[in-house]
């Protein structure tokens, strides 16, 4: 009898887990859970074990070629490159077939996204300009964590109009493109010509695979791995390799199959339920030990938080509103400016993407206090944006 009861309970638990992973908000919930666990560990008696785990040396060697990094660097440079493969595929799909495939569809979210990148950077600069050592952090509040933003929106999925969801997706995709450009232009250092040549050869190989509409995903994975390793060694940030790999995968194969859709389907679950939660676990572990009032009012924390809470909504809403009033773009049918403002506030959730940019802007040499304050600013700004965004979205969609 006890045995049967155990089996029944096991089946019930499995069904609950399956139901959870089918939720639209599952990815966002798992992200939040990972971040909370990281913060609890970082402020518990297990903090040393948590940090030691993240700093475990992990090596990869093939003949004379080797990559030696700590676990946290493998997560940030390796796993996040896989995430950017997905970003590259999503951008390509939307540009050729989706919400960004025509000028009329693309111009409104494009202008909004530009505002959402420029104004947060300006807000950051205005607050942090008194300290030249903080100049590198201007890109941190530019980012939007699309998984989290969509997770919050999914909580109200039944009352959120479809055009508003499409606007958020298009906005986030253009935002990702902006982040890619920023990483390429401002966070690549000490370039190696030899590694860049290897990277160029790998890119040519990917172009040929795409040109001949090769559908075998293993071919892209092998060449992509070579490209990632070459880019990593070149001094250009390795996540750019992910974007190039994503763009190289064909939308259609020779026999009408859809390689990009197949690979996107595989990576989407890994990204939502493994890669991003793991990144959050590795980077959200902020220790509050030794933090006083003076640190909380520091220019760095205020600049990042203000960029996310104020800069994002002002930039997105302001640019989109002006573009419509000047006749440069048209407000999508089925939504209003109050809902655009709610989405703009929601885009202040920088979380994992802002933390990723912070890890590039301030390395270990910047000092523990700088890294701690930047993460605190991101967590505070993202939390406030999530709460306000949810409340505004709930109110505006209810009114509609």
From Swiss-Prot:
Membrane topology listed for this record: Multi-pass membrane protein
Disulfide bonds: none
One Gene Ontology CC term in the entry: plasma membrane
Annotated localization: Cell inner membrane
Main location: membrane
Catalytic activity field: Na(+)(in) + 2 H(+)(out) = Na(+)(out) + 2 H(+)(in)
Gene Ontology process terms (BP): regulation of pH
Entries under InterPro entries matching the protein: Na/H_antiporter_dom_sf, NhaA
Family per similarity comment: Belongs to the NhaA Na(+)/H(+) (TC 2.A.33) antiporter family.
The protein's role, per its UniProt record: Na(+)/H(+) antiporter that extrudes sodium in exchange for external protons.
Protein name per the record: Na(+)/H(+) antiporter NhaA
Organism: Haemophilus influenzae (strain PittEE)
Gene for this chain: nhaA
């Amino acid at each position: 009898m006890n045995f049967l009861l155990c089996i029944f309970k096991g089946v019930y638990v499995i069904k609950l887990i399956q139901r959870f992973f089918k939720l639209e908000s599952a990815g966002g919930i798992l992200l939040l859970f990972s971040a909370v666990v990281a913060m609890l560990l970082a402020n518990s008696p297990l903090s040393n074990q948590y940090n030691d785990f993240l700093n475990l040396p992990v090596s990869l060697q093939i003949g004379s070629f080797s990559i030696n990094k700590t676990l946290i660097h493998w997560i940030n440079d390796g796993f996040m490159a896989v995430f950017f493969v997905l970003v590259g595929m999503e951008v390509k799909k939307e540009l050729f077939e989706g919400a960004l495939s025509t000028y009329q569809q693309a111009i409104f979210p494009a202008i909004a996204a530009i505002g959402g990148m420029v104004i947060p950077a300006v807000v950051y600069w205005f607050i942090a300009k008194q300290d030249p050592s903080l100049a590198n952090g201007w890109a941190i509040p530019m980012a939007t964590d699309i998984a989290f933003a969509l997770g919050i929106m999914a909580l109200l999925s039944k009352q959120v109009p479809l055009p508003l969801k499409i606007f958020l997706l298009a906005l986030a995709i253009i935002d990702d493109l902006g982040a890619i450009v920023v990483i390429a232009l401002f966070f690549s250092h000490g370039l190696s010509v030899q590694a860049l040549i290897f990277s160029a050869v790998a890119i040519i190989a990917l172009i040929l695979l795409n040109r001949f509409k090769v559908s075998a995903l293993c071919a892209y994975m092998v060449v992509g791995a070579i490209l990632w390793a070459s880019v990593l060694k070149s001094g250009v940030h390795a996540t750019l390799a992910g974007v190039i790999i994503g763009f190289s995968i064909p939308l259609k194969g020779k026999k009408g199959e859809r390689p990009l859709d197949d690979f996107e389907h595989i990576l989407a679950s890994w990204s939502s339920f493994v890669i991003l939660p793991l990144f959050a676990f590795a980077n959200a572990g902020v220790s509050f030990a030794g933090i006083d009032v003076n640190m909380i009012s520091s220019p760095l924390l205020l600049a990042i938080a203000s960029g996310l809470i104020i800069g994002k909504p002002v930039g997105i809403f302001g640019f989109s509103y002006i573009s419509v009033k000047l006749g440069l773009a048209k407000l999508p049918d089925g939504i209003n400016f109050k809902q655009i403002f709610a989405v703009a506030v929601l885009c202040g959730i920088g979380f994992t993407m802002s933390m990723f940019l912070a890890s590039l802007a301030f390395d270990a040499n910047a000092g523990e206090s700088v890294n701690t304050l930047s993460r605190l600013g991101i967590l505070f700004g993202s939390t406030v944006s999530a709460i306000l965004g949810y409340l505004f979205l709930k109110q505006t969609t209810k009114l509609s």
